[in-house]
Curated annotation (Swiss-Prot):
Family: Belongs to the bacterial ribosomal protein bL20 family.
Keyword RNA-binding: yes
UniProt KW keywords: Ribonucleoprotein, Ribosomal protein, RNA-binding, rRNA-binding
Gene Ontology CC annotation, any one: ribosome
Keyword GTP-binding: no
Classification via Pfam families: Ribosomal_L20
Protein name, as recorded: Large ribosomal subunit protein bL20
GO aspect biological process, one term: ribosomal large subunit assembly
Gene Ontology MF: a single term: rRNA binding
Organism this protein belongs to: Leptothrix cholodnii (strain ATCC 51168 / LMG 8142 / SP-6) (Leptothrix discophora (strain SP-6))
Matches recorded under SUPFAM superfamilies: Ribosomal protein L20
InterPro entries the record matches: Ribosomal_bL20, RIBOSOMAL_L20_CS, Ribosomal_protein_bL20_C
Role according to the record: Binds directly to 23S ribosomal RNA and is necessary for the in vitro assembly process of the 50S ribosomal subunit. It is not involved in the protein synthesizing functions of that subunit.
Length: 118
């Protein structure tokens, strides 16, 4: 039985890992052994941060809504409680966008919430 030479498969595997390490700094981009570890770690960070991204954006939306509603004389918690009471079902992403790009519409929602809370 002939001897199996692994040159082609090894080269392909190395090329794949080094392609994934493109843009890394130092030896992480061109030394296979180090690049392999760097690519694995990058994958772990990417996996973790895809989940964290959702939490980060929710915090951003809440901070924006809080700032906008406070400027109109209402705290975030009272604003959200008033939305629930008034049966206004708008999610935080849309409220945040509205507070930045359409302050008049956001102000009218705050007025409805204030009327509901009064």
């Amino acid at each position: 039985m002939p001897r199996v030479k692994r040159g082609v498969t090894a080269r392909a595997r190395h090329k794949k890992v080094l392609a994934l390490a493109k843009g890394f700094r130092g030896r992480r981009k061109n030394v296979y052994r180090i690049a392999k570890q760097a690519v694995m770690k990058a994958g772990q960070y990417a996996y973790r941060d895809r989940r964290a991204k959702k939490r980060v954006f929710r915090r951003l939306w809440i901070a924006r809504i809080n700032a906008a509603s406070r400027s109109l004389g209402l705290t975030y918690s009272k604003f959200i409680a008033g939305l629930k009471k008034a049966q206004i079902d708008i999610d935080r992403k849309v409220l945040s966008d509205m507070a930045i790009h359409d302050p008049a519409a956001f102000g009218s929602i705050v007025d409805k919430v204030k009327a509901q809370l009064a």
